[in-house]
A protein has these predicted regions:
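Aromatic/hydrophobic pocket-lining residues that form π-stacking "cages" and hydrophobic walls in ligand
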Residues: 58, 122, 202-203
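ATP-dependent carboxylate-amine ligase catalytic core
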Residues: 16-18, 22, 26-39, 64-151, ...
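Charged, amphipathic alpha-helical linker segments immediately N-terminal to NTP-binding catalytic cores
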Residues: 1-18
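Acidic, Mg2+-coordinating active-site environments of NTP-dependent enzymes
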Residues: 130-138, 153-242, 255-268
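Pre-Walker A (Motif I) flank of P-loop NTPase domains
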Residues: 38-41, 188
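Short glycine/threonine-rich catalytic loop with a Thr-x-Gly-x-Asp
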Residues: 69, 246-258
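A conserved segment at the C-terminal end of the G1
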Residues: 44-45, 53-70
Length: 268
C-alpha cells in the first residue's frame, strides 16, 4: 500500500469529482519524460462488460506460454497494489511508493484525479521494467480516459458495450460506443467482441475513419459453445477451448475474446 505521506498528498491534490480531460494527464506524462512511449508493446482494452476477465485470460495464457506480462487494471478489491502487476507479481509496496512519489512531485501539487496519478505511476513502472507485453484496462469510457495516451498499441480490444456511466459518457448506446471507440488508433488493429447492432455500426464507422483493421466476432472469428468446452474458429485457425475456471457462459465468451486477440497477433 502507499505510505501514509503519499495518501495525505492524495487528499490534498485530488479534485472533488471526476473530470474526463486528458490535459492533466498529458502534462504529467511530459514531465515524467513520456513513459508511455517506452513501455513494452501494449494491448489496450475498453468496453462495458468483461474487460477485467479478458485481461485475466490474456495474462494467464501469455504467462503459461512463458511471456513476461505487465498488467494495469481497476478497481482493486483489497489492496491498492492489485492495480499494477509487474512481470506477473503485484507491485511491491516500496516500488509503488517510489513511483507514486515521483509522479506526485512532478505534478507539483496541481489538481489531478486518483485514477490519473495511478495510471501515470503504472506507465512509469512499466517503462522502467522489461517485459514482453503490457495489458492495460481503461477506467471510464475510452476517448478521454487517462490510459488513452498510449500512442501506438500493439492491439486494441473492445469488449461488449452497453449502457453505462451516461452522466460522464453521454446518453444512449451510440454515444457510449463512440466514446469507447476513442481508444482506436490510426492504422492499429482491434479485436471486437460480440456487440449489439447499434454498437457494431458505431465501431465500424470509427474504424473506417481511422483505417483500423478489425477482427470482429461473427465475421473474422466466431465461437460456439458445447458441453465439453467451446469451438473457436477464425479466418486462420480452428481451436478447441476447454471450459474456463471462471463460471458462466459470459466467461466462455470472454475467454474466446482473449483467444481471438492472441490468434490475431499470431499472424504478425
Amino acid at each position: 500500500m502507499p505510505s501514509h505521506s503519499v495518501l495525505e498528498i492524495f487528499d490534498e491534490t485530488l479534485p472533488v469529482s471526476i473530470d474526463l480531460n486528458l490535459a492533466r494527464m498529458a502534462r504529467l506524462l511530459r514531465a515524467l519524460g513520456s513513459p508511455q512511449r517506452y513501455m513494452p508493446p501494449a494491448v489496450h482494452v475498453a468496453g462495458t462488460n468483461g474487460k477485467g476477465s479478458v485481461i485475466a485470460f490474456l495474462r494467464t495464457i501469455l504467462e503459461e506460454a512463458g511471456y513476461t506480462v505487465h498488467v494495469y487494471t481497476s478497481p482493486h478489491l483489497v489492496r491498492y497494489n492489485e492495480r499494477i502487476r509487474l512481470g506477473g507479481q503485484l507491485i511491491a509496496d516500496q516500488d509503488l511508493d517510489s513511483f507514486l512519489k515521483t509522479c506526485i512531485r512532478l505534478n507539483r501539487r496541481r489538481p489531478i484525479t486518483f485514477f490519473e496519478i495511478t495510471t501515470a505511476a503504472a506507465f512509469l513502472a512499466f517503462s522502467q521494467t522489461p517485459a514482453d507485453v503490457c495489458l492495460i484496462e481503461t477506467g471510464l469510457g475510452g476517448r478521454l480516459d487517462a490510459t488513452n495516451l498510449i500512442e501506438r498499441p500493439a492491439l486494441s480490444i473492445l469488449t461488449p458495450i452497453s449502457i453505462d456511466h451516461e452522466f460522464y459518457l453521454g446518453p444512449g448506446l451510440n454515444r457510449i460506443a463512440k466514446e469507447k471507440a476513442g481508444i482506436l488508433k490510426r492504422g492499429r488493429p482491434a479485436i471486437v467482441a460480440k456487440q449489439m447492432s447499434a454498437s457494431s455500426r458505431v465501431l465500424e464507422w470509427a474504424a473506417r475513419k481511422k483505417g483500423v483493421p478489425l477482427w470482429r466476432h461473427g465475421c473474422e472469428w466466431k465461437v460456439s459453445h458445447r458441453r465439453f468446452g467451446s469451438i473457436f474458429q477464425s479466418l486462420s485457425s480452428r481451436r478447441i477451448l476447454p471450459l474456463p475456471g471462471l463460471m458462466g457462459l459470459h466467461q466462455r465468451d470472454n475467454a474466446a475474446v482473449a483467444v481471438a486477440a492472441l490468434d490475431f497477433l499470431d499472424q504478425f
